[in-house]
Amino acid sequence: MIYIDINKFVPSQEWLDKSQELLDELISHRNNKAKRDEIIDRDSSQKHWKSLKEELKKLSFGKCWYSEAREIYSYYHVDHFRPKKSAIDDTSGKKVKRDGYWWFTFNYKNFRLSGGIGNTLKVDHFAVKANCAKCPEDDCEDEIIYFLDPTKKNDPKKLIINEDGEMKPSNTIETNWDHIRAKYTIEKLDLNFPELKTERHIKWKKCNSMIQEIDWLDAAYQASPSVRKEERIENKLNDIRKLIAPCEELSATNRACLRASRREWALALLEESIDVESICIDYKIPKEKNVEAT
């Protein structure tokens, strides 16, 4: 999972006006679920939120906000973080279905760019521990939710990746709320999907190999310093900087590998401000032939 500053994007006024028009229509049928679902299911309604997908991709350099993968995690969907028609809570061992957050159907701040695998599994799952919002007048910000949210700066930090490519809760105490939320998120989004886990493992091995190479180069430099050796070290550090840049697929895996190495230079590298404009200048977000949204 990667942090996405959703406030960096604002749709056109035309799009916002259309959203308000659709919301007003939903509110006019607030007591008629069948009619609301009919409005949401209309082709024109779905095209409306689908139209933002390319803009959402730009916020993450074309990576799924949950998995940080591109093609590994299938075609992209525009996920409604809070499900629109119905919501499911199965945390008690029993599946409980309630009305969804229909008033957020056309609110772009409820959209998350998701790979199809995770979003297909997530569907209507959205467990709330306390203060569940049930109507437009309720404040969703007061909800104590199970899902970690990529638009919340501290939520991605509640997940870690190990050398096997496995994603796990960073909080190891099973009864702690952060652990419970992380475990729920991993399971409901299948963030340890086999191909995804394998790709993370490959990334880790590559990064670890580069760490060892820098160790070797540094040892040679310390024993017999030269400008050329120093340049080779800096070039290799620049290669690693590219691995942790926001345009790099699964960059969180590379960051985890550097952190696990405990090398002083690696930890210092993680604290650096990434020169995104320079490193990601050649990155182009590919257009998809298949457009999916939920």
Residue ranges and their predicted role:
Residues 1-51, 72, 277-294:
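A boundary/linker detector
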Residues 22-63, 84-109:
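Short, charged surface segments at domain edges that flank catalytic/cofactor-binding sites
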Residues 59-61, 72, 77, 107-109, ...:
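Short, well-ordered loop/turn elements at secondary-structure boundaries
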Residues 63-69:
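Local cysteine-cluster metal-coordination motifs and their immediate loop/turn environment
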Residues 124-169, 173-175, 186-189:
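Long, low-complexity, intrinsically disordered segments enriched in glycines and aromatic residues
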Residues 172-294:
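C-terminal, charged low-complexity interaction regions
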